[in-house]
C-alpha cells in the first residue's frame, strides 16, 4: 500500500503553477470520470453495486467529487480503491499520481537501484499522461515510495531472517567497507569525527592482523550492540591540504587515483586506483561513497562517476558488491539536493551492482544507521548465496 513521507519545508509552487496543475488534474479526472460513467449506465448485477452507485459521494456534481478526491493522500486513495471495483479503477488517474510523484520525490530520504524512477516518465507532457496507453504512475509511485519499500522489507519471510542469522554465526570476520568521497573532506562538519564520537556505534581501532600497508586497519563499529563492521576511511590527500582547500573553497588533487585519459564535456576522465587503494578494493565487502549534497556546491559529476567506477571495478574483488551513497550535508539547516536528483547526476543507474542513496547529516548522523543497516543486509544476502 502506498503512502507518503512528510514533505520538506520547501515553499509551494507559485499560484499560477498551482492553478495550471489543479486544472490539469480536474480535466484528467473529468475525462476519466465520464468514460467510467458510461459503464455505470448499464444495469448492475447485484443490489450491492446498485447501492454503491447511489452513495452520497457519487451523487455529488462531478467537479465537486474531483475536488474532494484531489485532497486525499496516496495512502487514502489506496484505501478508497480497495473498497470496490469502481473506486479501484477511478483512483488510478495518471495525472493525479504523476502529481504525487513530482511532489513527494524531493522529500524522500532514500532511493535505491530498484526504485529510482526514469527521468523520462517525469518529463512527459500532460497530453501524453492522459493517453490510455500511458504508464501506470500509481505503480511507479508505490515502487519508489520509501514507505512501500519498508513495508515489503518487513514482510520478508521468517525463514530468510533465520537463515541470515545462522549464516552470520559462521562468519569469522566482520563485514569491511571502504569509505571515500568528497563529502568526507568538503563539509564544515566532519562526518568521521561524528562517527568516532558516537556512543551508539562504539568505535574502536581495527585489529592489527587486518592492517593494510599504507592504509591501516580501519575502525571497528557495532550496530545496535550486535552487528560489527569495519570501515577503512580513505582520504584523497593529506589533512593539511584538505583543510586549506576547504578554507579557500578550492579543489585538491586526488592522490587515490591516477589519470588514464582526459575527458571532455560529454565524457569524464578515466581513472584507475593506485596500488595501495587497489589492495583495499580487493578485501572489502562493499563501498560507502560520501557525496557532498549541499545545494550550493559545484560538482564534477562525470569525474565523480569515473572514480566510483574505478573503485568498484570487479577486477579488484568479487562482482556485485553493494555501494551505499551517503547524500551528506553538514547540519539540518543546510539546503540539500534531493537524493533522487543526486542519484541521476552520479549516473548510478549505470552501475552493475546494488546501491542505495541515503540522506545523511554529518553533525547528528541522521540517516547513517539506516544506510548501514541496508549495506549490512546486502552483504549478508550475498554471503548466504
Curated annotation (Swiss-Prot):
Every F-box domain range: 54-100
Disruption phenotype: No visible phenotype; mice were born at the expected Mendelian ratio and were healthy. The half-life of cyclin-D1 (CCND1) is not affected.
Coiled coil ranges: none
UniProt KW Phosphoprotein keyword: yes
Family matches, as Pfam families: F-box-like
Pathway(s) the chain acts in: Protein modification; protein ubiquitination
PROSITE patterns: FBOX
CDD domains linked: F-box_FBXO4, FBX4_GTPase_like
Listed SUPFAM superfamilies: F-box domain
Swiss-Prot/TrEMBL keywords: Cytoplasm, Phosphoprotein, Ubl conjugation pathway
Post-translational modification: Phosphorylation at Ser-11 varies during the cell cycle. It is low in resting cells and high in the S phase and the G2/M phase of the cell cycle. Phosphorylation is decreased during late G1 phase. Phosphorylation at Ser-11 is important for homodimerization and for optimal ubiquitin ligase activity towards CCND1.
Modified residues (Phosphoserine): 11, 46
GO cellular component: cytoplasm; SCF ubiquitin ligase complex
InterPro entries per record: F-box-like_dom_sf, F-box_dom, FBXO4, P-loop_NTPase
BP GO terms, sorted: cellular homeostasis; cellular response to ionizing radiation; cellular senescence; common myeloid progenitor cell proliferation; negative regulation of fibroblast proliferation; negative regulation of protein localization to nucleus; positive regulation of protein polyubiquitination; positive regulation of protein ubiquitination
Oligomeric form and interacting partners: Homodimer. Part of the SCF (SKP1-CUL1-F-box) E3 ubiquitin-protein ligase complex SCF(FBXO4) formed of CUL1, SKP1, RBX1 and FBXO4. Interacts with TERF1; this interaction is prevented in the presence of GNL3L. Identified in a complex with CRYAB and CCND1.
Entries under PANTHER family matching the protein: F-BOX ONLY PROTEIN 4 (PTHR16008:SF4)
Name of protein: F-box only protein 4
Organism: Mus musculus
Amino acid at each position: 500500500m502506498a503512502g507518503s513521507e512528510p514533505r520538506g519545508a520547501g515553499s509551494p509552487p507559485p499560484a499560477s503553477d498551482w492553478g495550471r496543475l489543479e486544472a490539469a488534474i480536474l480535466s484528467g479526472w473529468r475525462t476519466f470520470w465520464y468514460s467510467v460513467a458510461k459503464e455505470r449506465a448499464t444495469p448492475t448485477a447485484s443490489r450491492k453495486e446498485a447501492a454503491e452507485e447511489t452513495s452520497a459521494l457519487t451523487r455529488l456534481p462531478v467537479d465537486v467529487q474531483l475536488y474532494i478526491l484531489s485532497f486525499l493522500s496516496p495512502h487514502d486513495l489506496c484505501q478508497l480503491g480497495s473498497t470496490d471495483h469502481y473506486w479501484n479503477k477511478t483512483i488510478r488517474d495518471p495525472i493525479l499520481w504523476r502529481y504525487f510523484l513530482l511532489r513527494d520525490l524531493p522529500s524522500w530520504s532514500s532511493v535505491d537501484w530498484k526504485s529510482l524512477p526514469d527521468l523520462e516518465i517525469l518529463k512527459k507532457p500532460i497530453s501524453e499522461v492522459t493517453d490510455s496507453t500511458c504508464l501506470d504512475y500509481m505503480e511507479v509511485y508505490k515502487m519508489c515510495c520509501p514507505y512501500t519499500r519498508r513495508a515489503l522489507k518487513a514482510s520478508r519471510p521468517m525463514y530468510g531472517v533465520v537463515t541470515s542469522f545462522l549464516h552470520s554465526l559462521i562468519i569469522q570476520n566482520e563485514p569491511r567497507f571502504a569509505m571515500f568521497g568528497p563529502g568526507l573532506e568538503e563539509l564544515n562538519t566532519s562526518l568521521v569525527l561524528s562517527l568516532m564520537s558516537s556512543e551508539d556505534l562504539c568505535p574502536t581501532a581495527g585489529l592489527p592482523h587486518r592492517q593494510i600497508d599504507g592504509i591501516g586497519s580501519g575502525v571497528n563499529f557495532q550496530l545496535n550492540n550486535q552487528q560489527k563492521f569495519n570501515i577503512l576511511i580513505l582520504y584523497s590527500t593529506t589533512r593539511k591540504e584538505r583543510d586549506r582547500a576547504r578554507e579557500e573553497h578550492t579543489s585538491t588533487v586526488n592522490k587515490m587515483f591516477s589519470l588514464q585519459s582526459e575527458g571532455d564535456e560529454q565524457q569524464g576522465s578515466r581513472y584507475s586506483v593506485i596500488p595501495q587503494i587497489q589492495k583495499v578494493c580487493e578485501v572489502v565487502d562493499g563501498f560507502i561513497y560520501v557525496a557532498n549534497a549541499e545545494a550550493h556546491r559545484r560538482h564534477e559529476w562525470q569525474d565523480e562517476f569515473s572514480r566510483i567506477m574505478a573503485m568498484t571495478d570487479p577486477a579488484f574483488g568479487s562482482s556485485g558488491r553493494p555501494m551505499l551513497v551517503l547524500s551528506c550535508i553538514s547540519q539540518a539547516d543546510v539546503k540539500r539536493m534531493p537524493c533522487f536528483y543526486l542519484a541521476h547526476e552520479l549516473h548510478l543507474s549505470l552501475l552493475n551492482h546494488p546501491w542505495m542513496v541515503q540522506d545523511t547529516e554529518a553533525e547528528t548522523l541522521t540517516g547513517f544507521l539506516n544506510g548501514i543497516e541496508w549495506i549490512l543486509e546486502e552483504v549478508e544476502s550475498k554471503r548466504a548465496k
